[in-house]
Each structure stands twice: as structure tokens, then as C-alpha cells.
């Protein structure tokens, strides 16, 4: 059923028309006089690209010569990444495409624009306030992005964990990628990385990602409830009236900022839960939770039913072959491996990123990588458990009170029948 058009919608449409009439010939005048408004943003693809910084500490190739990982060098379109003597060097001829950031399993390459949480928040802002949000690259868009368009240097810059969280929380997100736009692009691995990341995320989330290939199909329509809330907030600022008195439905809509803040709070609470439960090894080393894993764990915490769809790599331990040399513990970039006092190797699945370095450095071949589902990645939510417990107690109290009232009512009716006789 279509949403009923009311007085507030009419007022919003009128206000849009008034705003457009304030300076109707401004653009024509500027064009004739050659005036350039410096305050307005200008299209420059370089503004959406940045050279990644490098952290050699978690790099698998830097930690051990036995590592077979060279994912960053494999995806680099101009071969500017060099790893030698435990150090990573990015040459000045870097294209700033960001593919190395997405390819690195340990997040040794850092780009503030491409951090999984920042990408998620950018998509959340666009998808929460608009009917459809789009993720695209500078080569495809070739203009300043609108409010519902999230622009990255290359479409392959978004990881599978980020896509998984986006697909689960926002079904109204699509990728804009014109046909053959990647054919002549120098970022040769970008389209392939996008396909692999989205295909895995779609399997995990159990739903498909939208795709747009025509520029004319890109729409920028705000969701009705958020447009109304935006208008009501403007009235509050100008008149001081309470929004709930004007329209309670609008007051109940959570703002974009509030939704992002709630997600950040969930991620922080999840990290605190893990830190208190298993955040430190027996050698007093603090385990490291990558940003991509944070997003995945947060999504699985809210949607545990999706855990069976998730496929991840975990090391499997053979106690008979292990000599307790500790090589795997020293090599693990996130300190997920731990040698316990009883002579047993323990691997914390929530921190393990499945890089396989522990299996590669084990000279006794006591470790091998196997594929499992994500059931071990579901972290209990203490707040949700507390609320569920309170709800169960309230339900039990209600049932008890209902039974007591029913019993008293039955006795009263019996007394009335006796008096009638």
C-alpha cells in the first residue's frame, strides 16, 4: 500500500520550490560572466585516493621467511611494493588504487579512507537516509558524488567482511559499474577482487547485491520518513516547537547519526566482551582484533542464524606431532595461538584470521588449515541476554499472576452459584 500523502508532504514540496526560486538565474549568470565559486567543490579524482601507509609488524612476509603470502604484490597493478629484510617499501610511482589495503589479510596496509568501519559508516549514512545507495569508483562516476553515492578509488577496495555487514544491514545498496568500464583500467585486479568479495558476502548474507550499469538509472531520492524528520528538525530549530507534538511518527524515527552511533557502540561492547573473556594470552600478550573481523563478529552477533553460511579457514591441531616449540605462537600476527600450561595448543577462533602462517612455520606439520562454518565466531551479547532474561522473568510473573486471578475468579463464581442455589 502506498504511503498516504498528507499536509506535511505538501509543505515539504513547496519549501523545495521556494529554495529553487531564491536564485533562479545564478548558474546562468556565473556561466556568462565566467565566475567561479571557489566555495563549491570541484571534481578531482585525486581527492578520493591516497597512498597507503605501511605497518610491517603484522605483515606475514615480514614476520617469517616461510610465509607464502604476497597478496599485496599480486594485486598491485604497477608493481611498486617491495618486501625485503623484514620491511615493506612502497615506491613513489604508487597509483593509490588501494587494492593492497583490501588484499592484505592482516591489515598491514593502512588507508584511513578505506578502513572497513569508515566504509561501512559512509554506506550507512547514504542507505539510511535514501531509498537507494550506490558504491562506485572514480573512473565510473567521473563527477562529484551525490549524498547517496559512496566513492572509492577502485571497486575492489571493499573487503568481503565489509560487504557482508553492508548486505546484512542495508538491502537497498547497489554497486554502480558501467559495462566494460574495467576493461581498459590499469587496476587490472579490481573487478576480479570485487567479484570475489561480493560473491562470498552474498553467500554469507543469503541475499544478492544490486548492480546498476547505466548512469540514468542512478536515483537520489530521500526516504520519506527521513525527509519528514529533516523538515521537522528544521521547524524545531526555527520555532522551538516539539516535534513529537507535531507528528509522533516522525519523532520516533532514529537519525542517521544515531544509527551509526549505535553500531559503533555495539562494536565497542563486543571488543570489550572479547577482551575480558579471552583478550590476553598466557604469555600476557594482548590479542589483536582486525577491523574487518570486528565488523563480521558484530554482524554475526546480531544475526547468529547466518553463521552456518559463513565459511572461514581455521588451523587444525595434531597433538601427537606437536613438540611444543612455540613457533606458531611467535608467528601469529593476531596472537590467536596460545600454549597452555598443560602442554596444549589453544587457538581462539574469534581472533584467528585464517592466514595460515602458523601451519607454514610449523616444522613438525602439526597444524593444517581446514574450512569450517562461522558458528565459533558468534559472540554472546551480554546486554541482549540480560534483556531476554528480564523478558522471560516478566512473562513468568505475568503467567503466574494470570493463573492466580483465574483461580480467584473461579472461586468467586463458585460462591455465587452456591448463593443462587
Q: What are these regions, as identified by a protein language model?
A:
Residues 166-167:
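Intrinsically disordered, low-complexity segments enriched in serine and arginine
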Residues 115-126, 373-385:
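Polybasic, low-complexity binding patches
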Residues 56, 92, 349-350:
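Short, well-ordered coil/turn residues that connect adjacent beta-strands
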Amino acid at each position: 500500500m502506498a504511503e498516504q500523502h498528507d499536509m506535511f508532504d505538501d509543505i515539504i514540496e513547496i519549501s523545495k520550490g521556494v529554495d529553487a526560486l531564491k536564485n533562479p538565474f545564478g548558474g546562468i549568470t556565473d556561466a556568462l560572466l565566467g565566475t567561479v565559486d571557489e566555495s563549491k567543490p570541484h571534481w578531482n579524482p585525486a581527492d578520493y585516493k591516497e597512498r597507503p601507509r605501511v605497518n610491517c609488524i603484522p605483515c606475514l612476509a615480514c614476520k617469517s621467511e616461510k610465509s607464502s603470502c604476497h597478496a599485496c604484490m599480486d594485486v598491485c597493478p604497477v608493481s611498486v611494493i617491495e618486501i625485503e629484510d623484514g620491511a615493506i617499501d612502497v615506491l613513489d610511482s604508487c597509483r593509490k588504487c588501494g587494492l593492497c589495503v583490501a588484499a592484505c589479510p592482516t591489515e598491514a596496509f593502512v588507508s584511513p579512507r578505506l578502513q572497513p568501519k569508515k566504509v561501512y559508516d559512509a554506506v550507512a549514512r547514504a542507505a539510511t537516509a535514501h531509498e537507494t545507495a550506490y558504491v562506485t569508483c572514480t573512473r565510473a562516476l567521473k563527477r562529484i558524488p551525490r549524498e547517496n553515492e559512496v566513492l572509492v578509488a577502485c571497486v575492489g577496495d571493499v573487503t568481503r567482511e565489509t560487504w557482508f555487514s553492508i548486505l546484512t544491514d542495508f538491502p537497498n545498496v547497489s554497486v554502480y559499474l558501467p559495462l566494460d568500464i574495467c576493461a581498459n583500467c590499469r587496476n587490472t585486479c579490481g573487478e576480479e577482487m570485487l567479484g570475489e568479495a561480493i560473491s562470498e558476502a552474498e553467500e554469507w548474507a543469503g541475499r544478492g547485491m544490486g548492480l546498476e550499469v547505466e548512469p540514468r538509472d542512478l536515483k537520489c531520492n530521500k526516504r520519506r520518513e527521513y525527509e519528514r524528520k529533516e523538515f521537522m528538525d528544521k521547524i524545531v530549530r526555527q520555532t522551538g516547537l516539539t516535534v513529537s507534538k507535531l507528528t509522533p511518527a516522525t519523532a520516533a524515527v532514529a537519525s542517521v547519526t544515531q544509527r551509526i552511533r549505535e553500531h559503533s557502540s555495539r562494536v565497542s561492547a563486543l571488543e570489550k566482551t572479547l577482551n575480558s573473556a579471552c583478550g590476553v594470552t598466557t604469555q600476557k600478550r594482548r590479542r589483536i582484533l582486525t577491523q574487518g573481523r570486528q565488523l563480521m563478529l558484530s554482524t554475526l552477533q546480531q544475526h547468529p542464524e547466518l553463521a552456518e553460511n559463513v565459511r572461514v579457514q581455521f588451523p587444525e591441531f595434531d597433538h601427537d606431532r606437536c613438540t611444543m616449540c612455540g613457533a606458531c605462537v611467535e608467528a601469529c600476527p593476531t596472537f590467536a595461538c596460545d600454549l597452555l600450561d598443560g602442554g596444549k595448543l589453544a587457538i581462539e577462533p574469534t581472533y584467528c584470521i585464517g592466514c595460515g602462517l602458523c601451519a607454514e612455520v610449523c616444522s613438525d606439520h602439526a597444524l593444517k588449515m581446514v574450512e569450517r562454518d562461522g558458528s565459533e565466531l558468534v559472540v554472546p551479547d551480554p546486554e541482549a541476554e540480560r534483556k531476554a532474561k528480564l523478558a522471560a522473568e516478566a512473562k513468568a510473573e505475568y503467567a503466574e499472576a494470570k493463573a492466580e486471578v483465574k483461580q480467584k475468579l473461579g472461586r468467586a463464581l463458585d460462591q455465587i452459584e452456591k448463593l443462587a442455589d
